[in-house]
């Protein structure tokens, strides 16, 4: 697999342990409509926005306070031709010590490249979920995940309100 992908790097005053706990609390920052487990190696979960996006993801590497790696096992989007664009990509959260005792979180969706039809939407979405919602969960204890009943219009409006 190519090492290319979309990345977001953030720094926090919180400890690596606190950043790690927020990352594995996927319902706290991505979507409350996650089924399955999201914390230990070999856990699998499903992310679903009905009629728009469905992903089944496995945790393939989990090292507390250091890293979490997901592998996308299967994925479908309603808005692209090639339904395999996310399949077999890796989503990495790498936690390390930064300057002045700060914690660095590097998020990379390895394999999500500009050539993909979904790239613009997915890049923007990760910017919201990781750059805003996960950041908020880490810094305040409350993220901005999708609600179980949210449809794509509600989700889009939430993203736009933060971006605007």
Question: Whereabouts are the PLM-identified features?
Answer:
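Hydrophobic ligand-binding cavity/cleft-lining segments
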Residues: 1-38, 163-164
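Intrinsic-disorder/low-complexity, polar/charged segments enriched in Ser/Thr/Lys/Arg/Asp/Glu/Gln
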Residues: 3-9, 44, 54, 67, ...
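Hydrophobic/aromatic beta-strand elements that line small-molecule binding cavities or substrate pockets
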Residues: 9-10, 55-61, 88-97
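Hydrophobic pocket/interface hotspot
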Residues: 19-23, 59, 70, 105-107, ...
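Short, intrinsically disordered, mixed-charge
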Residues: 21-29, 64, 128-132, 136-140
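Glycine-rich portal/gate segments that line the openings of hydrophobic small-molecule binding cavities
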Residues: 28-82, 163
